[in-house]
Amino acid sequence: MKPLSLLLAVASALGTAVSAGPAVIECWMVEDAGGGRLAKKPAALLLRQGPGTPPPRPDLEPELYLKVHDPAGTLQAAVRRYPSDAPPPHCELSRFIPLPASARWARGLTPGRSCPRALDGAWLMASVLSPIFSLSCLLRPQSEPQPEPALFTSATAVLTVLTYSPIAQIQLGQDALLDLRFAYMPSISEAAASLAPGPPPFGLEWRRQHLGKGHLLLAATPGLHEQMPAAQDGAVAFAAWDDDDPWGPWTGNGTLWLPAVQPFQEGTYLATVHLPYLQGQVALELSVQKPPKISLTPAPLVWAAPGEAPPELLCLVSRFYPAKGLEVEWELRGGPEGSFQKAEGQSWLSALRHHSDGSVSLSAHLQPIPVTAKHHGARYACRVHHPTLPTLGRSAEVTLEVAGLSGPSLEDSVGLFLSAFLLLGLIKALGWVAASRSTSKDPKEKKAQ
């Protein structure tokens, strides 16, 4: 049993290591170089390390090699969920200056318009984008000098705004739930400057941008009783801190709920969490989709005489979204030249028909060429490709019957049997009626004699 226990322990350790996510996230430090140009320098976020000092990175400037301390654990939890075989996330660093919120509805967060001295110093904003999660993390580098030579810079994650649904694909007419969570841990100087225990007031802002236009969807400042703009499109947000621990760290929820989404609600959603003089923002992409329904007529059989063309085939592709990306192919299955081939004939598509729910429909037409006896039993198929469908698409088919070559089907045999049975019953019934009439006439004739 000891070797088995050892193998289980090794497997458990390997599983933990695989699911722990990257220990280092490679980034780019992006700064304004003047004249409308941007300058980029390599940087890195060191999230975990083994015993001893961090591994050296001679390719990085010490102030851009950041050993991150995450008191709330939100950043670490997100990275642990990152698959080991996924491409590395995209990360950018930029300078951040603490400022009061500019929106009128958020002015209650900062009664004083000047920034407290406790927030002086350097700040960095880390933006990490991936299909798994999207986050922004406000980092405060350590201000105390380090022993020379400095190989890295310690930084604390003060405010982290995170979503696990950076790309949301919602079925047309269904509710959308856009995940948002955030965490805050004030630095020592901030905590010393604040006399009030418990989480600070915060503001939550959701905006939608689509086709170059943007507007405020929802704003909230829980507990401040400020005059808020009316929420749009029936949007509701779960805006609250998760706990009220006196000294933090604190986590909160800002998830947005949209009922019965429609195509006009597609676009980029910007979620911003406002703290007094600090902000964090993430972007989410919402797309609406609906797979098409497919029907083919006439069905299930189409008839034609040898040397004649079958009747026109109509493939109705109904109530799908988006309109772009739809392709229709006509196939002949089981024909004389193989199991699958392109159906010959004249084909065309109708114009789009728009429905009140935002979905669209169209019809595809095929006028097949004349058939021969070899086409008997072949099947015409309408195959539809659309972004909402699997790679092979979806299809509907009808069977071709060439006149004079098909024997009676099971339905025909059953019909003939029933017809013969009814005819036999009718003959017997008529015979019984005739016999009854002749029997009733005999006594009358005897009395007359």
UniProtKB/Swiss-Prot annotation:
Residues 1-20 form the signal peptide. The keyword Glycoprotein applies. Residues 292-399 form the Ig-like C1-type domain. Pfam families: C1-set (PF07654). Keywords: Disulfide bond, Endoplasmic reticulum, Glycoprotein, Immunoglobulin domain, Membrane, Signal, Transmembrane, Transmembrane helix. Residues 21-413 are lumenal. The record marks K428 as: May be involved in interaction with TAP. Residues 435-449 are cytoplasmic. The chain crosses the membrane at residues 414-434. Its main location: endoplasmic reticulum. GO terms for molecular function: MHC class I protein complex binding; TAP complex binding. Disulfide bonds join C27-C91, C315-C382. Heterodimer with PDIA3; disulfide-linked. Obligatory mediator for the interaction between newly assembled MHC class I molecules, calreticulin, PDIA3 and TAP. Up to 4 MHC class I/tapasin complexes bind to 1 TAP. Interacts with HLA-G-B2M complex; this interaction is required for loading of high affinity peptides. On its own or as part of MHC class I peptide loading complex, interacts with ligand-free MR1 or MR1-B2M complex, providing for stable MR1 pools ready for metabolite antigen processing. The N-terminus is required for efficient association with MHC class I molecule and for a stable interaction between MHC I and calreticulin. Binding to TAP is mediated by the C-terminal region. This is Tapasin. The gene is TAPBP.
